[in-house]
Amino acid sequence: MKIVKISPRGYCYGVVDAMVIARNAALDTSLPRPIYILGMIVHNKHVTDAFEEDGIITLDGPSRLDILDKIDSGTVIFTAHGVSPEVKQRAKEKGLTTIDATCPDVTKTHDLIEAKKAEGYHVIYIGKKNHPEPEGAVGIAPDIVHLIEKADDLKTLEIPTDKILVTNQTTMSQWDVQHLMEDIQKKFPTAEFHKEICLATQVRQEAVAKQADVADLTIVVGDPKSNNSNRLAQVSQEIAGTKAYRVADVSEIKLEWLQGVENVAVTAGASTPTPITKEVIAFLEQYDPMNPATWERVRKVPLQKILPRVKVKKEQ
């Protein structure tokens, strides 16, 4: 079996930065305890499990405000997906120490929404409902930001001005966003468009589109909650024309997927730890359909190998 290692794949700079911020927090003895992450720091359970070993508690809930209600003291880390001003204000009112790990690309979108609100615009925001990134973006100006996920959402959308900006969640499929923007332009011809697919998402999607077409199967390594991982599987199927499965790690690979397969493409979401992806590739490289000894699929990567290393500051 030949393995097509799609490149680039895996961690983006925003994810690495967020994890380094959280690791430094875990090592900072001056921070009030306990230390909480408001939702998953990045959408990967292996990462959140590793942080739990570091003493950092990941809390989840329907919204960031709902999660904050569970916290009465300590330190709160805002995730890479960003949060609304209301969440920041609520944390301040509760007397919590806050650390912001928002991805710079997400911050750019927040700044854009604020600037356009000041100019009297309404904003159409393309994103996934119930995902934390759109929650934070809509929360910048909930009175003028309209969240849409698919073309059907446009049918009932009415906006009381011709001053309209269209932007999007950074981890969406660039093809889906383009198609939706074309539909929006037909309904709102005066709209201005500001596509905000982050560069890391874009190049990873384009790599799958260009490199997965030679494979019989694509395996995307990524958490089920990771929107960018799910979009990579979608790109493989819809753009490259190659059947795709998303797995959290090697243990989720089903042997029947590999029957009759000669070429397997492998990629990984932007929040997927590199050792987890390497373990998937190693399994596929040694797999022999005629040798049951090669069929074992057990994740063996220790949690301490998941998180990036950080330098411990020496006391003066």
UniProtKB/Swiss-Prot annotation:
Keywords: 4Fe-4S, Iron, Iron-sulfur, Isoprene biosynthesis, Metal-binding, Oxidoreductase. Binds 1 [4Fe-4S] cluster per subunit. (2E)-4-hydroxy-3-methylbut-2-enyl diphosphate binds at residues 43, 81, 131, 170, 226, 228, 271. The keyword Iron applies. Dimethylallyl diphosphate binds at residues 43, 81, 131, 226, 228, 271. One of its GO terms (molecular function) is 4 iron, 4 sulfur cluster binding. The active site is at 133 (proton donor). It catalyses: isopentenyl diphosphate + 2 oxidized [2Fe-2S]-[ferredoxin] + H2O = (2E)-4-hydroxy-3-methylbut-2-enyl diphosphate + 2 reduced [2Fe-2S]-[ferredoxin] + 2 H(+); dimethylallyl diphosphate + 2 oxidized [2Fe-2S]-[ferredoxin] + H2O = (2E)-4-hydroxy-3-methylbut-2-enyl diphosphate + 2 reduced [2Fe-2S]-[ferredoxin] + 2 H(+). Catalyzes the conversion of 1-hydroxy-2-methyl-2-(E)-butenyl 4-diphosphate (HMBPP) into a mixture of isopentenyl diphosphate (IPP) and dimethylallyl diphosphate (DMAPP). Acts in the terminal step of the DOXP/MEP pathway for isoprenoid precursor biosynthesis. This is 4-hydroxy-3-methylbut-2-enyl diphosphate reductase. It comes from Bacillus cereus (strain 03BB102). The lineage of its organism: Bacteria, Bacillati, Bacillota, Bacilli, Bacillales.
